Curated annotation (Swiss-Prot):
Pfam families: HGTP_anticodon (PF03129), ProRS-C_1 (PF09180), tRNA-synt_2b (PF00587)
Protein name: Proline--tRNA ligase
Keywords noted in UniProt: Aminoacyl-tRNA synthetase, ATP-binding, Cytoplasm, Ligase, Nucleotide-binding, Protein biosynthesis
Enzyme class: ligase
Highest taxon of the lineage: Archaea
Keyword Cytoplasm: yes
Source species of the chain: Saccharolobus islandicus (strain M.16.4 / Kamchatka #3)
C-alpha cells in the first residue's frame, strides 16, 4: 500500500460520500427527508468522543449545560427584528397540531438566542448572578435551499453546540468573547483541525451581533468551510426582550450577551482533513477504535486458533490500559479485505499477528498515517502503542497546519487574486481600505466569498485592490461551502 491523495483532493465530494457510507459513519441521502442523515454506530461514537472534548472544556470554564425546547413561537422569534430577518428564509414552521391550525406558528429552532434570553429574563435579576454561562448540544433546523451536503450543509444540524452568556458590561462580554476564542482554539487543537481566525465584516455578521469572529478551515478540494463562530451580541437581544438586571449602583439596565457555536462541520473536518485515497486517518484523541488487531491465519486450524488466542490476549492488554482495541475475528474475510475495512474506518494503528509473531512473542505494528511499521516484544507493546499514538496525533496536527499555511496566498491585484482562487483555491489575502463598498466589490470580482480580516493588527504597506487608497488591513477571500 502506498500513500496517494488523488481521489481525496481532486474528487473530494465523491471521496467524502464514499467514506461516510463504506466506513459506516453516517448514512446520508437514503432517509426520506432531504438534508437529513442518520448517524451510524461507529460514526455516533466518533461524534460522542468529539462532544466529550467540547463538553469537558466548557464545563471546566464555568459553563452550565441546559436543554431548551425545540419549538419557538413566531411572535417570540420575531422580537429581535435583525435576527429574524437573517433567518426568516431558513425557518421550518409547525402550523398544525393534529388536524387543527395553530393560533401561533411554531418554529423549529434555527438557533436559540431569543429562546434562551426569554428564560434568562426570568432567572437573572442582579449583577450578583453574573457572569452566567449556559450551553446546550442539540439539533437545529435550517431550510437550506442550496444543494445539501452530508455534515456540511444540512437541514437538520444534529450536533449544534451553542453557548450563551450574560454580562454586566460590554467589556465583560468582550472578555468572554476572548475566552470563547481560546476555548475553541483548544477544541480544534485537540481535534487536530487547523484554522484561520477572522472577524467577519459588518455585512456578514451573525444576525443581531455587534461582532462575529469565525474559525475557517481549508478542505482537501481547496474550498473553505466555517467550523466555529463567536458573537458579541451587545445589548441587542436583551433590549429587544426587555431583559434588565440591577447593576452595582442600583440602576436597571440591559445586560450584554455573547453566543458561540460549533456544529457537525467540526466532525466533517476531522474525517476529511487527514485522509488519503484509502479513507480517513482519525486523530487518536477521538478515534472510536485506536487499535485493530488483524490475525494472520496459519497453515493449519490449530495454528490459526493459537494465533487468534494470542491476538485476543494482546488486544485485552491494550484495553486494560485504556487503549480502545478490537480484534477482527471474522474467519471468512482475508487479511487484505480486513485491512481495507479498517483503513476506511480511519483506525490509527493496525497490529498484524501471525504464526511468526506467535512463535517469537512479538507484535507487528503498522501506522495508518505514514505506513511506518515496527516489530516489538509482547511486553513492550503497550508502551510502544502509547508512544506511536502520541506521535500520530502530533504528526497529523503538524501536517494539517503546514498544508493550511501553504494554501494561503497574498495578492495585491484583483486579477491575480481571481486566478489563484480559480486555479488553486485556498485563501487569498488582498489589501483592503476597510470600506463595505470595496469589500463587496472584491467578492463580486473574485466570484468568491469574503471571510473577514485578521483580528490582530496587520500592517499593510499597499493600496486597496479596488479604490487604490492606503490599505488598513487585508481581506481574506475564498471559495466556500
Amino acid at each position: 500500500m502506498q500513500i496517494t491523495r488523488e481521489k481525496w483532493s481532486k474528487n473530494f465530494s465523491e471521496w467524502f460520500d464514499w467514506v461516510l457510507r463504506e466506513g459506516e459513519f453516517y448514512d446520508y441521502g437514503r432517509y426520506p427527508v432531504k438534508g437529513m442523515g442518520v448517524w451510524m454506530p461507529y460514526g455516533f461514537k466518533l461524534r460522542q468522543n468529539i462532544i466529550s472534548i467540547i463538553r469537558n472544556l466548557l464545563d471546566s470554564t464555568g459553563h452550565e449545560e441546559v436543554l431548551f425546547p425545540l419549538l419557538i413561537p413566531e411572535d417570540l422569534l420575531s422580537r429581535e427584528s435583525t435576527h429574524i430577518k437573517g433567518f426568516e428564509e431558513e425557518v421550518f414552521w409547525v402550523t398544525k397540531g393534529g388536524s387543527e391550525d395553530l393560533d401561533v406558528k411554531l418554529a423549529l429552532r434555527p438557533t436559540s438566542e431569543v429562546a434562551i434570553t426569554t428564560m434568562e429574563n426570568l432567572w437573572l435579576k442582579s449583577y450578583k448572578q453574573l457572569p452566567k454561562k449556559y450551553y446546550q448540544i442539540v439539533s437545529v433546523f435550517r431550510y437550506e435551499t442550496k444543494a445539501t451536503r452530508p455534515m456540511i450543509r444540512l437541514r437538520e444540524i444534529t450536533t449544534f453546540k451553542e453557548a450563551h452568556t450574560v454580562h454586566e458590561t460590554y467589556d465583560d462580554a468582550q472578555r468572554q468573547v476572548e475566552e470563547a476564542i481560546e476555548i475553541y482554539k483548544k477544541i480544534f487543537n485537540n481535534l487536530t483541525i487547523p484554522y484561520v481566525l477572522s472577524e467577519r465584516p459588518e455585512w456578514d455578521r451573525f444576525a443581531g451581533a455587534l461582532h462575529t469572529y469565525a474559525f475557517d478551515t481549508i478542505m482537501p478540494d481547496g474550498k473553505v468551510m466555517q467550523i466555529g463562530t463567536v458573537h458579541h451580541l451587545g445589548q441587542n437581544f436583551s433590549r429587544a426582550l426587555d431583559f434588565k438586571i440591577q447593576k452595582k449602583d442600583g440602576s436597571l439596565d440591559y445586560p450584554h450577551q455573547t453566543s458561540y457555536g460549533i456544529s457537525d462541520r467540526a466532525i466533517a473536518s476531522v474525517i476529511a482533513i487527514h485522509g488519503d485515497d484509502h479513507g480517513p486517518i482519525l486523530p487518536p484523541s477521538v478515534a472510536p477504535i485506536k487499535v485493530v488487531v488483524v490475525p494472520i491465519p496459519a497453515k493449519n486450524e490449530e495454528g490459526t486458533q493459537q494465533v487468534m488466542k494470542y491476538s485476543i490476549e494482546i488486544c485485552e492488554m491494550l484495553n486494560k490500559n485504556n487503549i480502545t482495541c478490537v480484534t477482527d475475528q471474522d474467519t471468512e474475510k482475508t487479511p487484505g479485505e480486513k485491512f481495507y475495512i479498517w483503513e476506511i474506518k480511519g483506525v490509527p494503528i493496525r497490529l498484524e499477528i501471525g504464526p511468526r509473531e506467535l512463535a517469537s512473542s512479538t507484535v507487528f505494528i503498522k501506522r495508518r498515517d505514514n505506513l511506518k511499521s515496527y516489530t516489538v516484544k509482547k511486553e513492550e507493546v503497550v508502551n510502544k502503542v502509547k508512544e506511536v499514538l502520541n506521535e500520530i496525533q502530533e504528526d497529523l496536527r503538524k501536517r494539517a497546519w503546514e498544508s493550511l499555511k501553504s494554501r494561503i496566498e497574498y495578492a495585491n491585484d484583483i486579477e491575480k487574486a481571481k486566478n489563484i482562487l480559480e486555479n488553486n483555491s485556498g485563501i487569498v489575502e488582498v489589501p483592503w481600505c476597510g470600506s463595505k463598498e470595496c469589500g463587496l466589490k472584491i467578492e463580486e470580482l473574485t466570484n468568491a466569498r469574503v471571510l473577514g480580516y485578521p483580528i490582530e493588527d496587520r500592517k499593510v504597506n499597499d493600496k486597496c485592490v479596488i479604490c487604490k487608497m492606503n490599505a488598513k488591513t487585508v481581506l481574506r477571500v475564498a471559495k466556500t461551502y
